[in-house]
Amino acid sequence: TGVEYGDYTINFVQGCSHGCKYPCYAFSLKKRFGQVKKYEDWLKPYLVSNTLELLDKEIPRFKDKIESVQLCFTTDPFMYGYPEVERMAIDSIKKLNAAGIKCTTLTKGILPQELAQCSSDNEYGITLISLDEDYREMMEPGAAPYAERLAALKGLHDQGCKTWVSVEPYPTPNLIQQDLMELLESIGFVDKIIFGRT
């Protein structure tokens, strides 16, 4: 992948229901390569139904090269309000872990507490760019409320899981006036924080 989150990735959903108002690189990429035409189409996600079968084929081919797998780079593995996406994410993680492969997740959804039963090498993250719900409703209307994301992350942390937060794209002051220290204090329990900007 060439990014810090993981050397391999799995994208088992096409599209994303979060409806983020800031530029979405995943949508831009899919549009550029003709896989989706309009943002409205992107907002209607669908599952790659043969994901587990594909993993059965791909894991033996790449197992010796893989250090970790990121779920997901072009969508959300725990898309808010989509239990079938959550189930596929958990099943994929379990299959990868059974092959000795570490997984890293990043979501604007709610991390299921069932993840605490998976490999202790896994890392579970949320995107958190503010604590202001009005701002979330404006900029990430289909994503989980911030408090729910934080509570799920804290729940996994309290069960001994490795946790992290991506604070990106961090909104500039012309978009919202907020106290960065308050945001950082709310995530002080995590193992790692990554910053980005709009």
Please annotate each region the language model reported.
Residues 51-198:
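Conserved AdoMet/S-adenosylmethionine-binding subsite of the radical SAM
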Residues 1-68:
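N-terminal [4Fe-4S]-dependent radical SAM core
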